[in-house]
Amino acid sequence: MQLKFDHDLVLNQESINRIKEFSHSICSIDDIKKHGGRIITVGDVTTENLERAGLDIFIEVVDLKTKRGEKTYNHRENSISIENRPGTISLSLIRAIESSIKSNKKTRIEINGEEDLAVIPIIFYGDINTLVVYGVPDTGMACIFINTEIKSMVTDILRDLNGKT
């Protein structure tokens, strides 16, 4: 089912709990190298680590800082810059992810605010067999392999947040 979005989505506790149910695994760079398919990253440290390892990243979603403020990152030319408040999935983030995936071109999305929830629209718009890699503070990297089951779960969450049936 195709959803149409016309406003920012604000997460509630129920949605947060449902998101925590996602089937992800802690993964290493070697695990990611074995994937061989499209990779989308969320987070500056994760993106930097995969770039250093020579991995080909299709879409990068970053906020130019780390959670603990240990390091900041620089803006890159030709990046898409958007706003996204903590606890929300802004309409501009949704549109940037949708257009980036549909364009089939490598893209960097730089967020003023928080990038953590970008995983949700990435899964919604992402192709089956895409690997989404994001950072888990004090733990490492987590991987979600997009399949029909996780897409269905995300669609349900977005439908509820969007207030449409």
Swiss-Prot record:
Known pathway: Cofactor biosynthesis; coenzyme A biosynthesis
Keywords on record: Coenzyme A biosynthesis, GTP-binding, Kinase, Nucleotide-binding, Transferase
Enzyme Commission identifier(s): 2.7.1.237
Domain of life: Archaea
Enzyme class: transferase
Residues bound to GTP: 44-45, 63, 65, 115, 138
GO biological processes: coenzyme A biosynthetic process
Catalytic activity reported: 3'-dephospho-CoA + GTP = GDP + CoA + H(+)
GO molecular function, one term: GTP binding
Pfam family, one: DUF359
Family in the record: Belongs to the GTP-dependent DPCK family.
Task of the protein: Catalyzes the GTP-dependent phosphorylation of the 3'-hydroxyl group of dephosphocoenzyme A to form coenzyme A (CoA).
NCBIfam families registered for this protein in UniProt: PRK01160.1-2 (NF002247)
PANTHER family per the UniProt record, alphabetical: GTP-DEPENDENT DEPHOSPHO-COA KINASE, UPF0218 PROTEIN TK1697
Official protein name in the record: GTP-dependent dephospho-CoA kinase
Species per Swiss-Prot/TrEMBL record: Picrophilus torridus (strain ATCC 700027 / DSM 9790 / JCM 10055 / NBRC 100828 / KAW 2/3)
Taxonomy of the source species: Archaea, Methanobacteriati, Thermoplasmatota, Thermoplasmata, Thermoplasmatales
